[in-house]
């Protein structure tokens, strides 16, 4: 079984890791992309990625100083511990013990515009390159054409080694698309999370992202490898709904409560990792209840 996740824009390198580390599978391809990005001025980066001048300059500096990392350093640490976006608030990788991290290393994969695919302990340097970026390379006009079938082959080979056909999709469409058209014998399962709002259950993006991380954590901690076992996921008030689900899209429902949202907002604001977007999303969700 392989679980795929999206990366995050928010990164944190201010931690010490006692875990082992590994090296990304496609460092040579990453270097090719960086060499292209190194030729671009901050204004070009801002235009290409829709960034502010400040963020464009930050990433210009990142590209100029980037080099393939094979050792832990202040700016080269395990990927799943570095990412701190909404999904990773749910995952809380920093709390995993060695046995849990070993399970994650085998089963979790993070899709990446720069690295293609990352294992949790693969060393990663700070970067910004979303999969949907229309960066022209010798392989084509965007990153999907650059990566071609490399990422898919990597995942399929790993499933073959594990003698499994189960692929759990906890990634955003922008990233999952890099896997292309998968063989029909691969069982792709896409868990969906809905919260009760204004009289109906619906997908609330901010909560759904956190729920993806929660499910990843739950799978790791319970060492789940069978599809049917996913039905037992019950963290943070979510419950499996047989009536709402299909064979490939298990749906989990939660009747959100305003006090819980307010408590989460308080903890989010006090966290150094919280992004302004995440905070505003919680405020909007709370007000609308």
Predicted segments — roles?
Residues 19, 182-184, 267:
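Short, glycine/charged-enriched secondary-structure capping and boundary segments
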Residues 261-281, 285-289:
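Low-acidity, Ser/Thr- and Arg-rich intrinsically disordered low-complexity segments
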Residues 37-40, 222, 277:
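Alpha-helix boundary/capping residues
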Residues 22, 132, 185, 279-288:
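Residue-level signature of transmembrane alpha-helix interfaces in integral membrane proteins
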Residues 4-95:
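Active-site helix-to-loop segments that bind/position phosphate- or nucleotide-bearing substrates
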Residues 1:
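N-terminal beta-strand-loop-alpha-helix module at the start
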Residues 93-246, 251, 255-260:
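Internal, well-folded beta-alpha domain core
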């Amino acid at each position: 079984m392989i679980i795929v996740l999206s990366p995050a824009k928010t990164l944190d390198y201010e931690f010490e890791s006692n875990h082992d580390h590994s090296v990304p599978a496609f460092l040579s391809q990453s270097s090719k992309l960086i060499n292209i990005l190194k030729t671009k001025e901050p204004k070009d980066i801002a235009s290409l990625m829709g960034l502010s001048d400040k963020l464009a300059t930050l990433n210009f500096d990142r590209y100029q100083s980037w080099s393939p990392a094979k050792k832990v350093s202040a700016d080269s640490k395990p990927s799943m511990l570095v990412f701190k976006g909404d999904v990773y608030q749910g995952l809380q990788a920093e709390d995993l013990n060695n046995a849990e991290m070993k399970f994650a290393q085998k089963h979790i994969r993070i899709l990446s515009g720069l690295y293609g695919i990352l294992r949790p302990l693969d060393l990663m340097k700070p970067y910004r390159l979303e999969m949907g970026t229309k960066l022209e390379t010798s392989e084509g006009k965007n990153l999907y054409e650059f990566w071609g079938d490399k990422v898919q082959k990597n995942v399929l080979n790993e499933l073959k080694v594990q003698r499994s056909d189960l692929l759990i999709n906890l990634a955003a469409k922008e990233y999952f698309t890099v896997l292309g058209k998968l063989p029909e014998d691969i069982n792709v399962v896409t868990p969906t999370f809905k919260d009760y709002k204004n009289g109906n259950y619906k997908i609330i993006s901010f909560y759904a992202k956190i729920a993806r991380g929660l499910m990843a954590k739950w799978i790791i901690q319970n060492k789940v490898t069978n599809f049917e076992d996913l039905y037992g996921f019950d963290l943070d008030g979510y419950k499996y709904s047989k009536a709402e689900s299909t064979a490939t899209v298990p749906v989990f429902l939660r009747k959100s409560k305003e006090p819980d949202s307010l408590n989460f907002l308080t903890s989010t604001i006090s966290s150094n990792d919280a992004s302004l977007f995440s905070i505003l999303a919680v405020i909007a969700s709370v007000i609308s209840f």
